[in-house]
Regions:
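Alpha-helical segment of the N-proximal tetratricopeptide repeat
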Residues: 29-55, 59
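TPR/TPR-like (Sel1-like) alpha-helical repeat modules
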Residues: 92, 150, 155-173, 183, ...
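Canonical tetratricopeptide repeat
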Residues: 69, 108, 144, 178-181, ...
Length: 260
C-alpha cells in the first residue's frame, strides 16, 4: 500500500515537473524578447520593437510604461489611432514618473489626435505637456495649441497661443529654423486677429510685437485664414517628429519582469 502511494506521488511530481518546465522556459524566453524589444526601442527601431511588444501584450499584463512604449511605436508607424488608444490607457498610471518623461507621452498623445484632426482631444494633452516639458520645447507646444484653436475657429485663443509661441521663440531667434517659424506665426496671428475682429468688432485685440526682425510686423502681408489652413493641412502628412530622443525616457536597466 505504502509502495503504491510513493509510486503515485513520484508520478504526480514528474507530471508537475514536466508541466512547469516548459512554462518557466517560455517565460525566460519572453523576458529575453522583452529585453530585445527595449533595445530596438532605444535604437529607434520602432517597427521591430512593436512586433515583439504586440506579441507580449497578447500574452502578459504589461505595465503602463510598456503600454506607453507601444503607443510611441505606433506613433512612429503613423498609426495614430492605436498610438492614442495605448497612450490614453497608459497615461493615468504614469503619475509617479519623471516629469519630462510624462511630457513626452502627453505630447505624443496630443500629436496623435492632432494628426487625426481631433483637435479638441489634442488640446488637453498639449496643455499638460506645457506644465512639464523643457523651456526650449514650450514654443513648439504653444504653436501647436495655436493651430488647434485656429482649426477649431476659436480665433482669440489661437491668437493668444501664437503670441505665447512668439514670445517663447524670441529666446532662440538667431536660429534659422526659428526665424522661419516666427515669420509664419506673425502671419497666422494676424489672420486670426482679423477673423476675430470681424466677428467681434467691439473687442479689438491689441497686437503685441516682439520685433522678430525690424519692421516684420509692419510689412507682413495678411493671408486669408482659408489659404493658411489649406497650406498647413497639406504639410500635415510629413514624418512625425517628437522633440526628444527616446533614449531620454528609457532606462538601460529597465526591468523585464513579466506577469501573467
Amino acid at each position: 500500500m505504502a509502495g503504491n502511494i510513493r509510486k503515485e506521488i513520484a508520478i504526480l511530481l514528474l507530471l508537475l515537473l514536466n508541466t512547469c518546465m516548459p512554462v518557466a522556459a517560455q517565460k525566460s524566453k519572453d523576458a529575453e524578447e522583452l529585453g530585445k524589444a527595449l533595445e530596438y526601442f532605444a535604437s529607434a527601431k520602432y517597427h521591430e520593437a512593436l512586433l515583439i511588444f504586440q506579441h507580449l501584450d497578447r500574452t502578459y499584463r504589461l505595465n503602463d510604461r510598456f503600454k506607453a512604449y507601444i503607443g510611441l511605436c505606433y506613433y512612429h508607424e503613423w498609426d495614430y489611432d492605436n498610438a492614442a488608444r495605448y497612450l490614453e490607457e497608459a497615461i493615468p498610471g504614469l503619475d509617479t514618473f519623471a516629469p519630462h518623461e510624462r511630457s513626452v507621452y502627453y505630447y505624443t498623445a496630443a500629436e496623435s489626435f492632432f494628426n487625426m484632426r481631433r483637435y479638441g482631444k489634442a488640446v488637453p494633452y498639449y496643455e499638460m505637456t506645457l506644465s512639464l516639458c523643457y523651456e526650449r520645447e514650450k514654443g513648439d507646444v504653444c504653436y501647436r495649441l495655436g493651430l488647434c484653436f485656429m482649426f477649431m475657429q476659436e480665433w482669440k485663443k489661437a491668437y493668444d497661443q501664437y503670441m505665447n509661441a512668439e514670445r517663447l521663440y524670441q529666446q532662440y531667434k538667431k536660429e534659422k529654423e526659428v526665424q522661419g517659424r516666427l515669420a509664419q506665426i506673425v502671419r497666422m496671428a494676424a489672420a486670426c486677429r482679423t477673423e476675430y475682429e470681424a466677428v467681434s468688432p467691439q473687442d479689438s485685440l491689441q497686437k503685441k510685437t516682439y520685433n522678430t526682425t525690424e519692421g516684420d510686423n509692419a510689412t507682413t502681408q495678411l493671408k486669408s485664414i482659408s489659404t493658411i489652413i489649406k497650406s498647413l493641412t497639406s504639410t500635415m502628412l510629413s514624418k512625425p517628429v517628437i522633440p526628444v530622443l527616446v533614449k531620454d525616457i528609457i532606462s538601460k536597466k529597465e526591468k523585464t519582469n513579466l506577469q501573467k
